[in-house]
Amino acid sequence: MVAVAGALWHQFAMAKKTYRGSCHCKKLRYEADLDLAEGTGKCNCSYCWKVRAWTMAIKPEAFRLLTGKESAREYGFREGSTNHHVFCGHCGVRLYTHGHVEEIGGDYVSVALSTLDDLSPSELVEAPVRYMNGRDDDWFHTPAETRHL
């Protein structure tokens, strides 16, 4: 039975699904086309550590900010950074990061999975997770310890 459930999940997850997401106060709302079978990410860099990030990177054309552009605020960790963390200026919830990293294919949007309003717990726990060692600036290798992420 488990194998069948896994096979069904695999078939279900092979197609992109449009999810809706928002901040806590609902001033910012978005849609994102995701295929969770492509994998999600958890990182141990100083920023992700602070916000306990669990994300999924997608191409910008798969992301649509529907409402709240005027409430959106951005934070960049370093001067000149090409990565910008977007959060609601009213409730403070971080929704996504956007930027450009050539090594991962250029422009991207990284959606905070915790802000998806219609993501079921079963979909989330079935999604593959890739761990990144941002703390040591070794982004393409899994850190020695991941249980805390």
Language-model features: locations:
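A short Gly-Trp-Pro
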Residues: A5, W9-S22, K27-L149
